[in-house]
């Protein structure tokens, strides 16, 4: 499995943190912001969209996500990460933001990244820790499959076709 890291901002209820749960299962590891420099960083402020071409970065250094509140999304607005990537548009399946565009939980974001880079089994495995997890893959099956096959320059066309 690809190494999964997260930066925990302590902005939400720790009992509801999807990444803290993965940490308890030994699947994810908490790091400081400085520890994310060489990682494939999932961030909405990135200019580059995640694609299958990013697989080698994830295999080499792992994937990192910021675990924080959607209500305080500007926390890292000024920071740039060398391997920062934004996810293509997807719908959330978590109970708090179900059906909302781009309001993914951290575990959904990591699972989407894994799926798009060709690690579908790993994506399914981490989502299995939540009763609603597999709903994310079902809800987004068609766009995820198209993103997985597409070259980076085609992803905006796919986003527009679905959303």
From Swiss-Prot:
<feature type="binding site">
    <location>
        <position position="87"/>
    </location>
    <ligand>
        <name>S-adenosyl-L-methionine</name>
    </ligand>
</feature>
<dbReference type="InterPro" id="IPR022968">
    <property type="entry name" value="Tsr3-like"/>
</dbReference>
<dbReference type="GO" id="GO:1904047">
    <property type="term" value="F:S-adenosyl-L-methionine binding"/>
</dbReference>
<keyword id="KW-0808">Transferase</keyword>
<protein>
    <recommendedName>
        <fullName>16S rRNA aminocarboxypropyltransferase</fullName>
        <ecNumber>2.5.1.157</ecNumber>
    </recommendedName>
</protein>
<comment type="function">
    <text>Aminocarboxypropyltransferase that catalyzes the aminocarboxypropyl transfer on pseudouridine corresponding to position 914 in M.jannaschii 16S rRNA. It constitutes the last step in biosynthesis of the hypermodified N1-methyl-N3-(3-amino-3-carboxypropyl) pseudouridine (m1acp3-Psi).</text>
</comment>
<keyword id="KW-0698">rRNA processing</keyword>
<dbReference type="Pfam" id="PF04034">
    <property type="entry name" value="Ribo_biogen_C"/>
</dbReference>
<keyword id="KW-0963">Cytoplasm</keyword>
<comment type="similarity">
    <text>Belongs to the TDD superfamily. TSR3 family.</text>
</comment>
<feature type="binding site">
    <location>
        <position position="18"/>
    </location>
    <ligand>
        <name>S-adenosyl-L-methionine</name>
    </ligand>
</feature>
<keyword id="KW-0690">Ribosome biogenesis</keyword>
<dbReference type="GO" id="GO:0106388">
    <property type="term" value="F:18S rRNA aminocarboxypropyltransferase activity"/>
</dbReference>
<dbReference type="GO" id="GO:0005737">
    <property type="term" value="C:cytoplasm"/>
</dbReference>
<dbReference type="InterPro" id="IPR007177">
    <property type="entry name" value="Tsr3_C"/>
</dbReference>
<keyword id="KW-0949">S-adenosyl-L-methionine</keyword>
<dbReference type="GO" id="GO:0000455">
    <property type="term" value="P:enzyme-directed rRNA pseudouridine synthesis"/>
</dbReference>
<feature type="binding site">
    <location>
        <position position="106"/>
    </location>
    <ligand>
        <name>S-adenosyl-L-methionine</name>
    </ligand>
</feature>
<feature type="binding site">
    <location>
        <position position="66"/>
    </location>
    <ligand>
        <name>S-adenosyl-L-methionine</name>
    </ligand>
</feature>
